[in-house]
């Protein structure tokens, strides 16, 4: 019976083929498809689609044809059938959409899953009615559905909204679409665009979306109005302000380069670069700290620049640079800032002391306290009016030969600390989360007479000399968010180059270096007691190994055995090759398994792709890895 059926199938096809050639004429592009290397049946099927008017030959570029040619005949016919059955009415880039269908097919094939034909999509009648009512456009790709962007001129004719106008919407039912989301959120204010992320494998949404409003007030109103809103029985939305990241952290920058040098050089290899944030060494204003932040006009430009710089094919000043997403700045609530009585003072000379600051600022009002950290300080006033007056009059003035900058201090980010605590609780290692907020710069290692020494030496334990906890506990302000929210956590970036010793093993990352030089006197005090400040490294009596637990000092003692070779040697920039260099913020000590830890704003495709990264050659879908509520994953 099977042979008979198969025979009939072949016979029917043989009967149909002459009918096709006689009754339906091939388009002028059929021969081109054959010459491009497509199998005859595949070329005929694609030519049939051209004749239906769903897509024109000019809509498909060379990359789409090349990708289709790589499929076997059965797979190519299946892809074209799915493409033909898809609703292309809102698809503006049909070539990209076809590539997305091919990518989805391969993923299903790899997973051994079949196309879910029963999956319910959006109600096209309701979608059409929504678009007719609002005048917005809808652009559909395999990875997202984009409503608006820009909106009609009758709604908003200004420039594209900036930071603080976007919200993240989580916990969306998977079969819910624009016809239900838009009427709810447009109550908060005019919408610039709505991006509903789609899962090509299931055909449904991914459970979250990004909505950009035409103003900050509308975005804040959307959070108040729609957070915890029951959009369906038992289904409550989660809504919060989202920050689209358009800033990159770049390491391995020559320290003699100026802001203008960096802007010019990176503008040659990336597009959309609008600013460079560069910080100088406190003791030498002519040198930078070995890193900078590149700010791009939008997240799309930043994502493209990041991929390009990480490829290893692009070199800056002859070297491959380290590139990561920078932690985005989250602006505090205006109502909270209106109560701040603390000033953040930066660009202080090394000779400036707390006493000098107290004398300079006390003339504006009574001070509660002054705390100087490195080349910046916090000045606490008892009265807000005095703080504002001091800021207005002292900003830009010179103290000890340096022009200072003053802004109101930002209160601590409680949500970030909660996230840090959650990550810390789930981690077995004793080290805190370096990858999100590395510790401040540490004092130089002890200069003594002990032999040995290490190289690398920039990964200090966070509890060592840590002003973060001290300052948060006693002062209540989070200094990580100052200088644009980026500089302070990376202050110690270039420390690794300074630690070099004679003899001894090569140290691994992640712990303070042992004392360097030749010999060191034993600490004062009674024999048998630990030296105070033991985390600084092993005292006399051991050699070589780094970062181990504190050892007790027993009088003068005898010299210990030679330490083992340390872990990865850090701090040296690779001169050539295509491997992305290790970032000094990303510790990779093998013993601690740090290399597997996430880094701030790392694209989400490695731990679960929330970005809808299925677009045309990955270029259309990767740009929305915004910061959003982690609790709604």
Curated annotation (Swiss-Prot):
Keyword line: Acetylation, Cytoplasm, Disease variant, Endoplasmic reticulum, Intellectual disability, Isopeptide bond, Microsome, mRNA processing, mRNA splicing, Nucleus, Repeat, Ribonucleoprotein, RNA-binding, Spliceosome, Ubl conjugation
GO biological process, one term: mRNA splicing, via spliceosome
Biased composition (Polar residues): 588-604, 622-633
GO cellular component terms attached to this protein's record: catalytic step 2 spliceosome; endoplasmic reticulum; nucleoplasm; nucleus; ribonucleoprotein complex; spliceosomal complex
Bias type Gly residues, positions: 501-510, 558-570
Residues in coiled coil: none
Highest taxon of source: Eukaryota
Localization annotation: Nucleus; Microsome; Nucleus, Nucleoplasm; Cytoplasm
Domain RRM: from-to ranges: 165-244, 246-328, 341-411
GO molecular function, one term: RNA binding
Biased composition, class Low complexity, residue ranges: 525-541, 605-621
Keyword Ubl conjugation: yes
Disease: Neurodevelopmental disorder with dysmorphic facies and skeletal and brain abnormalities: An autosomal dominant disorder characterized by global developmental delay with impaired intellectual development and poor or absent speech, corpus callosum structural defects and cerebellar hypoplasia on brain imaging, poor overall growth, facial dysmorphism, and skeletal defects. Variable additional findings include hypotonia, seizures, and ocular defects.
Protein name: Heterogeneous nuclear ribonucleoprotein R
Organism per entry: Homo sapiens (Human)
Name of the coding gene: HNRNPR
């Amino acid at each position: 019976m099977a042979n008979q059926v198969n025979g009939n199938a072949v016979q029917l096809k043989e009967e149909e083929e002459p009918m096709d050639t006689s009754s339906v004429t091939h388009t002028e592009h059929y021969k081109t498809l054959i010459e491009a290397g497509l199998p005859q049946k595949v070329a005929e099927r694609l030519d049939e689609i051209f004749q239906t008017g769903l897509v024109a030959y000019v809509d498909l570029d060379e990359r789409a044809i090349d990708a289709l040619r790589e499929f076997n005949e059965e797979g190519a016919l299946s892809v074209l059938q799915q493409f033909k059955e898809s609703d292309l009415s809102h698809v503006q880039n049909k070539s990209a959409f076809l590539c997305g269908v091919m990518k989805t097919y391969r993923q299903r094939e790899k997973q051994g899953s079949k196309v879910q034909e029963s999956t319910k999509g959006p109600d096209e009648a309701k979608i059409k009615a929504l678009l007719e009512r609002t005048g917005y456009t809808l652009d559909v790709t395999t990875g997202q559905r984009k409503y608006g962007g820009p909106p009609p001129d009758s709604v908003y004719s200004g420039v594209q909204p900036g930071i603080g106008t976007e919200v993240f919407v989580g916990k969306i039912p998977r079969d819910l679409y624009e016809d239900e989301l838009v009427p709810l959120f447009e109550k908060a204010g005019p919408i610039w665009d709505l991006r509903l992320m789609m899962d090509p494998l299931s055909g449904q949404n991914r459970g979250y979306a990004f909505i950009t409003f035409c103003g900050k007030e509308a975005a804040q109103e959307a959070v108040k109005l729609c957070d915890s809103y029951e959009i369906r029985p038992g289904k409550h939305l989660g809504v919060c302000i989202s920050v689209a990241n358009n800033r990159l952290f770049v390491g391995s920058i020559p320290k003699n380069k100026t802001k203008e040098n960096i802007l010019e050089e990176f503008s040659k290899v990336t597009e959309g670069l609008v600013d460079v944030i560069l910080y100088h060494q406190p003791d030498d204003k002519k040198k930078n700290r070995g890193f900078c932040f590149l700010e791009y006009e939008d997240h799309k430009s930043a994502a493209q620049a990041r991929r390009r710089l990480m490829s290893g094919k692009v070199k800056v000043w002859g070297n491959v640079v380290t590139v990561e997403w920078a932690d985005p700045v989250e602006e505090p609530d205006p109502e909270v800032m209106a109560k701040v009585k603390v000033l953040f003072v930066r660009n202080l000379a090394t000779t400036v002391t707390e006493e000098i600051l107290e004398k300079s600022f006390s003339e504006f009002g009574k001070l509660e306290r002054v705390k100087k950290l490195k080349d910046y300080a916090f000045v606490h006033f008892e009265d807000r009016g005095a703080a504002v007056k001091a800021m207005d009059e002292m900003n830009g003035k010179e103290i000890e030969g340096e022009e200072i900058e003053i802004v109101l201090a930002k209160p601590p980010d409680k949500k970030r600390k909660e996230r840090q605590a959650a990550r810390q609780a789930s981690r077995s290692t004793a080290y805190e989360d370096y990858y999100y907020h590395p510790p401040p710069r540490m004092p130089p290692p002890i200069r003594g007479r002990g032999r040995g020494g290490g190289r690398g030496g920039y990964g200090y334990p966070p509890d060592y000399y840590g002003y973060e906890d001290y300052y948060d506990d006693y002062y209540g302000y989070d200094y990580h968010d100052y200088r644009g929210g980026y500089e302070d956590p990376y202050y110690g970036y270039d420390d690794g180059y300074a630690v070099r010793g004679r003899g001894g093993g090569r140290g691994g990352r992640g712990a303070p270096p042992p004392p360097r030089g030749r010999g060191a006197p034993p600490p004062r005090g009674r024999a048998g007691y630990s030296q105070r400040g033991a985390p600084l490294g092993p005292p006399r009596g051991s050699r070589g190994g780094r970062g181990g637990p504190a050892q007790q000092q027993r009088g003068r003692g005898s010299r210990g055995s030679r330490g083992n070779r340390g872990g990865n040697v850090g701090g040296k920039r690779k001169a050539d090759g295509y491997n992305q260099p290790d970032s000094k913020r990303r510790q990779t000590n093998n013993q601690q398994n740090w290399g597997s830890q996430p880094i701030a704003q790392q694209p989400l495709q490695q731990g679960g792709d929330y970005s809808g990264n299925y677009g045309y050659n990955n270029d259309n879908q990767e740009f929305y890895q915004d910061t959003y509520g982690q609790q709604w994953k």
